[in-house]
């Protein structure tokens, strides 16, 4: 099983670009940069897209331009157009339950209250069995503060940790294609930015 679509979740527009909720898009932006495959807006897929080759595999990159809670529209449209199955999709998203500086791969599971994941599961026919890259952003400590927290910008010290985890996640994504998911997961899950 090869990954054919890598998605980075975000809200569109300059006012959201540096917010924690856009951590998934930061990862896809970095992959596109590392592999010299600039993202271009493609309205028919409701997002910015690019095409990369990893170890001979053709992979699409996607950052939806819909708002977060409508991410499934972009993912579902692209998956349907290219006949990509849920287990061939990797969705990168911000994760409240991991601290900044940590990122983890995961297959399947619920949406954990994440509206982007919720909409993707729905638009994939209620199938949650896609891969996720959970990018740790930490938790404000009070569930009533979550919305303001994810839509806020991390302080410089936290941003540095998040960026380092995303950099390691990009390297581990390439390792996944070279040596398999088990090896990539083992390496990523032992990483913690200091």
Curated annotation (Swiss-Prot):
BP term (GO), one: rescue of stalled ribosome
Principal location class: cytoplasm
CDD domains: PTH
GO MF terms held by the record: peptidyl-tRNA hydrolase activity; tRNA binding
GO cellular component, one term: cytoplasm
UniProt keyword list: Cytoplasm, Hydrolase, RNA-binding, tRNA-binding
Tree of life domain: Bacteria
Keyword Phosphoprotein recorded: no
Binding site for tRNA: 16, 67, 69, 115
Site feature location: Discriminates between blocked and unblocked aminoacyl-tRNA: 11
Enzyme class, first EC level, given as a word: hydrolase
Assembly mode: Monomer.
The protein's name: Peptidyl-tRNA hydrolase
Source organism per UniProt: Salmonella dublin (strain CT_02021853)
């Amino acid at each position: 099983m090869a990954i054919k679509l890598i998605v980075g979740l975000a809200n569109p527009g300059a006012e959201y670009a540096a917010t924690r909720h856009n951590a998934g898009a930061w990862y896809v932006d970095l992959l596109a940069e590392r592999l010299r495959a600039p993202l271009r807006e493609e309205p028919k897929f409701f997002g910015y897209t690019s095409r990369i080759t990893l170890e001979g595999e053709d992979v699409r990159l996607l950052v939806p331009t819909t708002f977060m809670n409508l991410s499934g529209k972009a993912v579902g449209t692209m998956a349907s157009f290219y006949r990509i199955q849920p287990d061939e999709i990797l969705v990168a998203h911000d994760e409240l339950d991991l601290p900044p500086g940590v990122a983890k791969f995961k297959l399947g599971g619920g949406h954990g209250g994440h509206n982007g994941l919720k909409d993707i599961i729905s638009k994939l026919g209620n199938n949650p069995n896609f891969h996720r890259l959970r990018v740790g952003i930490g938790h404000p400590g009070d569930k009533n503060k979550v919305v303001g927290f994810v839509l806020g910008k991390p302080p410089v010290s936290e941003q540095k940790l998040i960026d380092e985890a995303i950099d390691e996640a990009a390297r581990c994504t390439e390792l996944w294609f070279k040596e398999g998911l088990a090896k990539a997961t083992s390496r990523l899950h032992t990483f913690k930015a200091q």
